[in-house]
Amino acid sequence: MGLAGVKKKQQIGVDPRNSKWAKDTNRLGFKLLSSYGWVNGNGLGEKQHGRIHNIKVSLKDDTLGIGAKATNDLEWSGLGEFNAIFGRLNGDESAYGVYAEKAKVQQLTYERQSANEKGLKSLELSRRFVLGGTFTSEFSEWMQKAEEDEDRVCEDASSSDEAKREKRKKHSSKKKSKKKTSTGSALDPKKLEKITKKKKKEHKKKDKESSSKKRKSGSSDKEEKKKKKIKLKDKPESTSSVEKVKEGNRPASIHFHTRRKFLAQKRAAVSDPVALREILGIKG
């Protein structure tokens, strides 16, 4: 038992997409284009931006009429395009469909611009292809701002330091100029000579005092050295030689004593079989 409905048989032809004609290289158009340097698979035009694929036939698989499927949300009749054409011819921009057409044209121009920016030839590739960009996080922006702030602070500090140095230089130059003017104007040449003579006398006195102190210290050092030499000569040589001998023999005698003790203990352990067994860990 089959379904209660009219049976429809569909007979598809041998070559529904007309590929036999498309692949035929003996056609006049194919020969003419190949004589100009065209190769199968290339597009037409200076930049070869023309269509590469052949035009295909689409089969209508339904019995619906024109305007049965909605092209827009508001238009069902399928006559909106004609209204737009008439509106453009009459110069009426408020006609139905004119705004939609303008929007389509603007969209196409925008897509072409984006394709040119991306360096792509076809609009289809520009719709699918998305250019990648560098990821800039908030942290990198914050770091840039911090570096800029540090540079500003350093510049301000350097400018303030330079200003302080300039002030100090000016102040010191003013002081020097004041001193020069005061010494040149207030003091007479006679007074200056007296001052210089006094200073020379003071220097001479100081030099004499220092030289006398050095002589006294040198004589006292010589006397102390002589006394030490006399004391060393008075001491007997015998006591010094005995002490040297004692100091030299002490470590050697201690070393030999410990060595003898160790050898005696070793001999006692080897001679006693019980002690040997205990050392080697042998039972029985």
UniProtKB/Swiss-Prot annotation:
Residues 25-71 form the G-patch domain. Involved in rRNA-processing at A0, A1 and A2 sites and negatively regulates telomerase. Belongs to the PINX1 family. The lineage of its organism: Eukaryota, Fungi, Dikarya, Ascomycota, Taphrinomycotina. One of its GO terms (molecular function) is RNA binding. Residues 166-181, 196-206 have a biased composition (Basic residues). The keyword Phosphoprotein applies. Pfam families: G-patch (PF01585). It is found in: Nucleus, Nucleolus. Residues 149-253 are annotated as: Disordered. One of its GO terms (biological process) is rRNA processing. Residues 207-224, 233-249 have a biased composition (Basic and acidic residues). This is Protein pxr1. The keyword Aminoacyl-tRNA synthetase does not apply. Keywords: Nucleus, Phosphoprotein, Ribosome biogenesis, rRNA processing. SMART domains: G_patch. The modification Phosphoserine is found at residues 159-160. PANTHER family: G PATCH DOMAIN CONTAINING PROTEIN (PTHR23149), PROTEIN PXR1 (PTHR23149:SF31). GO terms for cellular component: nucleolus; nucleus. The gene is pxr1.
